[in-house]
Amino acid sequence: MTAPTDEPRVQLPTDQDLVLKVIPMPGDCNANGDIFGGWVMAQVDLAGSVVPARYTQGRMATVAVNEFVFKQPVRVGDILSFFSTVSRIGRTSITVKVEVYAERFSRQGQYIKVTEASLTYVAIDDNGKPREIPKMDPAAAI
């Protein structure tokens, strides 16, 4: 990991949906004092489900975490912004890309990418079985 002063600053994406903003608290830390990776993963799963929910129009479940990369540590007080976009829509499943950016508490207005992931969700019926995703205009899902 790079030192805090060497963190690469980036611009927030303009071609993805902002689906979640959250500030991690001290209770979310691991033994090293950084935010626990499992907490970040849970937030990514929640954020990743927002766009697919617009398409599935009903129950869905996370079926796969295809890729998950921790690029920088997350710290207490960071303002995390979660952006998501659809990568693929299948008959019963939808894959999304999620990118997470941190605005460090001590450096307001400056962003670094801390996490990126790809997750797949499957539309399910009341019995938990896969069901077809209704056809819709992607513009209507925004």
For each feature predicted by the language model, list its residue ranges:
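HotDog/MaoC-like acyl-thioester-processing domains
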Residues: A3-P4, P8, T14, L18-L20, ...
